[in-house]
Amino acid sequence: MPEHQQPELPHASAAGANGAATDMVITRNLDGSMKESAPPATVPAQSPLPLPASAVIVDTSASPHAAHRPVPVGNVRLSDAFLAPRLRINRETTIPSQYAHLEETNRLRNFRRAAGEFDGPFEGIYFNDSDVYKWLEAAAWAIAANPDDREDDLTAMIDAVIGLIEGAQDETGYVNTYFSVDLVGERWSDLRNKNELYCAGHLIQAAIAHHRATGSDRLLNVATRFADLICDTFGPVAEGKREQTDGHEEIELALIELYRTTGERRYLDQARYFLDIRGTGTIGGDAYH
């Protein structure tokens, strides 16, 4: 390697003005200047894959105060010898193995129990549902980055998990397997410690990812029903609501992104309420949290 250069950075391609992908390797010299060159001949050329226009992780396209605009997942393609194989292994091996772990640890069985398909105790810790939702979000973005593989086993896994969540949602829109069956009366009783709104936030984020990656409203419908219940439940006492906020932040950013996805203003207002009520009238203690 020439002594005046640092190691090559991973190279990527981005869609240009005409929609074509332009590959480049970016090298940073010691003086801080950047050099662009063609990728190594060993990297096979690929065509960019079409994705829904809204396949962005955070959508600030209609946010007037946002300084940056996101790039859709399909507009950037890593093709280097380091990160690209990692993404492929994540897609083909890691995410499917995590699905198996969700089964082995009975996280998925908890949803079957909530749906009345299994008679037995809840297993695991009270925030286990969030692990299922985090897996769904990761799997959805993996599908978004590989739309030609949407009919493979990973898609079937996603659909199966969504079916379990649909079955676990009750008639009010509530979804949380820990507070189902024998603990229904304890819902919203320990927001500081039991992560109910935290789990709800991860469900919403998983639903948004799935919707943006596939165009399907299936999980999004579950999430909006739950979000509507949350909006109807939490707010000023004068409105007959619970004047509380969560102990573990998460629901706020999820509701903001749900607003960006649906255009439903009440989700943005609810996120603002949760932020404004935190710490009101106190500098510590349970009321602060």
Predicted features, each with a name:
Residues 2-289:
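Glycan-recognition and catalytic cores of secretory/periplasmic carbohydrate-active enzymes
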